[in-house]
Amino acid sequence: MKKKFAVFAVILSSFILFSCSRSGVVISVDENDLFKLNYGSFEDELNMFDISLTGNISTYIAMRDGFFYIANGESKKIMETNSYGDLLSLYYNNESVRNLEFEQEDSSVSTKKSVKYPFNTLGPIAVDSRKYLYVVDTLPQDRFEHDEENRLLLNNVVLMFDVNGQFVNYIGQQGLGGTPFPIIRKIYTTKKNELVVVCTTNEGLLAYWFNNRGALLYRIPVTAEQIPMPADTEEEEGRYYTSVGNVVPDYNENKLYIKVDFYQEMLDSTLKKNSGVTYRKTLLYALNLNNGEYEAPLEIPAYEHTILNDMSKTTDEIPFDFLGVTENGWFFFIITNEDGYIVQMVQPDGQKIFKRSLTVDHSQVFYYTLDLSSSGIVSGLFVLRNYAKVSWWRTDSLLAAYISN
């Protein structure tokens, strides 16, 4: 089924390969703990304030070509490290970070880089193949704007730094220097070094697609009402409800992938009344931005959560979260379970599905943030009681071995 969608275009000048069945045993992928980060105010430490208190934590991670980029909103700085944890670059607000060893080194011989910028509240971060760095920041309150028509507070921008750490400009809704965004959920970069910004609105999600110079190419609203309904839902009793879970850009093409969960209204046959809703299935839609059409959706198997009682067994289906897509077109989905996470990797045509377990002791973790690289490596920053750690799982090796065969 194809459905036209309104796209606003702006024309401007070593694993053993086991195929996991849906109910089979899930094989674990070894976690590689790469390095630790202490808590504190020094340049190579994280400032997490009091991690025992409730509240939002504004710390995010991205990995590119083996280098890690950590946006630590609590200390208003960004750290670039290698896989050993050596600090290579520091972007910082000089009112929050002082007495830097970086500043004391001879810049003519040092390969380290320090960049001053008046960060406010940092958010998600991304890096392209040029090593241009993009990071979400919140404007000072006196620069907030309001979208009265859509009832939105506009206070997020994306800051753009070049390979030398030079601040280029901030990106808003129209491009360089544009109107601030509503709440930004996530940012992505593509093979062509284009930037995709995904925002949350009162109606759903809103994606902005920019070229590698920060000029707006597409503005794409995504709401539940615009999603094509599967043909089989029209033949069943009980109303269907749609929930848009996430929007992720394709790495190579002008496409957006939209994960949609479908729920069905349950009817009591005796009372002829609604008795609740139940999860039915998850579909992944590809929206072609060149022609505004949805391609045929791909059904994504749900996670089966089994509860064993004394004399019975109950199995519930729970939809996965959409983590991202690799440069080879594999779709990654993830869900939390008692042992850590289950990652489900789906081939572009859906013919092959791998499930792997990522073991994490949730009882020791106060906060975490995950990242999927374009090559298929899952990385994570985990905030523990006495320190934070950066780990990765080489799920890319599994895919590479399968593709080579």
Regions found by a protein language model. Give the residues of each.
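Bacterial N-terminal signal peptides that target proteins for export
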Residues: 1-8
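Bacterial N-terminal signal peptides
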Residues: 9-17
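Eukaryotic scaffold repeat domains enriched in small/polar residues
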Residues: 20-405
